[in-house]
Amino acid sequence: MKLGIVIFPSKMIQDKANGLRKRYDPHYALVPPHITLKAPFEAPEEQLETIVKELRTIANKTNPFTLHVGKVGSFAPVNNVIYFKVEKTPELTFLNEEMHKGFLTQEREYAFVPHLTIAQKLSDAEHADILGRLRMKDFYYEQTIDRFHLLYQLENETWNVHETFHLGKGSK
């Protein structure tokens, strides 16, 4: 089964991102706006319980933290993805690193750059035009993050939450 681990921002941030994603992201209908902690990976269904236990341990070791989202960035020229920048806090870095250790180890395709995708699969001309327009706008949001989610992908390529993990000691 295909799994992924993400943080969902507040509804306000999701609404702002979706206003842009509707027009510029072909994956708009497949998954809500999110910050990827661990890129999609394959795991046999019989390992799911072990993965869930490991994620509970990680959640218990991580305190809630403030997420800062602002400004627009791009991964060009590697690919034409436009995103809201997310400040790389020690907590986000810790979560990402923990999700690539031990049982969850996997080869990373890219360095960890926390972000919220708002446009992708654009032509070079579309990318330049949209990025230029969005960089002129002022975006800044912050919120407390107290959970992350393990997602699984369905046959129709949509993603659903398998389990939510609350941050901090005493979380279940």
UniProtKB/Swiss-Prot annotation:
<comment type="similarity">
    <text>Belongs to the 2H phosphoesterase superfamily. YjcG family.</text>
</comment>
<feature type="short sequence motif" description="HXTX 2">
    <location>
        <begin position="115"/>
        <end position="118"/>
    </location>
</feature>
<dbReference type="GO" id="GO:0016788">
    <property type="term" value="F:hydrolase activity, acting on ester bonds"/>
</dbReference>
<dbReference type="Pfam" id="PF13563">
    <property type="entry name" value="2_5_RNA_ligase2"/>
</dbReference>
<feature type="short sequence motif" description="HXTX 1">
    <location>
        <begin position="34"/>
        <end position="37"/>
    </location>
</feature>
<dbReference type="InterPro" id="IPR050580">
    <property type="entry name" value="2H_phosphoesterase_YjcG-like"/>
</dbReference>
<feature type="active site" description="Proton donor">
    <location>
        <position position="34"/>
    </location>
</feature>
<keyword id="KW-0378">Hydrolase</keyword>
<feature type="active site" description="Proton acceptor">
    <location>
        <position position="115"/>
    </location>
</feature>
<dbReference type="InterPro" id="IPR022932">
    <property type="entry name" value="YjcG"/>
</dbReference>
<dbReference type="InterPro" id="IPR009097">
    <property type="entry name" value="Cyclic_Pdiesterase"/>
</dbReference>
<protein>
    <recommendedName>
        <fullName>Putative phosphoesterase Bcer98_0945</fullName>
        <ecNumber>3.1.-.-</ecNumber>
    </recommendedName>
</protein>
